[in-house]
């Protein structure tokens, strides 16, 4: 059986689990409260990159891989500050049994913000508040990406808990990414889950994949069959992040590709991909 089909079976065997935290990448799984969901569920990887930003696969290669090597039913292509790759992926996926959400990982001044269900590119470099407003103006959903990742500019460093509550409620997120398969050390996911719980916000999971080998490692489980059902599940707080961490080999490969990008494309592209410049 394909390795990407195993996590779903493992997740279904667990219920009433606040968070199972495992430090054995690719074999043990992080699971949130599966008891919220019925048996009929859909799997969506909501954090994927292509060659239209800093990923190593084209949008077409991504769709072919998802269809042939995973049991994902929905994906969101979320290139850095760009939606052209997502549009290509969506068009190519027509009739192939996979729903593609137009997404973007936007480099706001305070950190990365994931936009879903947008139709126009949102420019980087705005404040988090203005970025969220721009997403909502398009009818999209705004999600705090890896908010406690210490390696990139992240919203947790700029007061996520204070700004998203009644104290300073300008950060009106629709959800928080509480399972990002790429994070190392792993406690950043645990901290994000605690923040989402405290704020009463839905949680999502994604692989943050920049290469095909890690597509589907992290994902979001919800009741439904398609992207439209995912939007509804997020609105009602009925999503469940689950999946595996990147292995140390995956991390090494990703680091090597970052070094290669620096040498081939210049420092600015690499720095933009981790949110240090806009």
Question: Model regions: which residues?
Answer:
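Beta-strand-turn-beta hairpins that frame and shape the catalytic cleft
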Residues: 39, 110-113, 137-140
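A short C-terminal boundary segment appended to hydrolase-like catalytic domains
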Residues: 240-278
């Amino acid at each position: 059986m394909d390795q990407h089909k195993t996590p779903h079976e493992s997740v279904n065997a667990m219920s009433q689990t606040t968070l199972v935290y495992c430090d054995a990448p690719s074999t043990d799984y992080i699971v949130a409260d599966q008891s919220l969901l019925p048996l009929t569920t859909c799997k969506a990887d909501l954090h994927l990159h292509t060659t239209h930003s800093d990923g190593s696969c084209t949008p077409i290669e991504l769709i072919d891989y998802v269809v042939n090597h995973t049991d994902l039913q929905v994906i969101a292509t979320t290139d850095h500050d760009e939606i052209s790759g997502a549009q290509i992926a969506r068009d190519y996926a027509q009739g192939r049994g996979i729903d593609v959400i137009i997404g973007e990982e936007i480099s706001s001044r305070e950190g990365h913000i994931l936009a879903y269900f947008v139709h126009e590119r949102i420019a980087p470099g705005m404040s988090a508040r203005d970025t969220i407003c721009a997403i909502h103006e398009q009818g999209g959903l705004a999600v705090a990406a890896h908010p406690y990742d210490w390696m990139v500019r992240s919203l947790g460093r700029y007061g996520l808990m204070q700004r998203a509550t009644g104290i300073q409620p300008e950060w009106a997120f629709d959800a928080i990414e509480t399972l990002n398969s790429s994070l190392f050390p792993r406690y950043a996911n645990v901290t994000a889950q605690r923040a989402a719980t405290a704020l009463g916000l839905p949680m999502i999971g994604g692989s943050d994949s920049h290469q095909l080998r890690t597509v589907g490692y992290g994902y979001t489980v919800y009741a439904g069959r398609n992207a439209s059902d995912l939007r509804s599940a997020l609105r009602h707080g009925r999503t469940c992040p689950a999946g595996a961490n990147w292995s140390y080999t995956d991390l090494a490969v990703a680091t090597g590709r970052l070094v290669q990008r620096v040498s081939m494309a210049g420092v600015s592209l690499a720095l933009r991909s981790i949110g240090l410049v806009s």
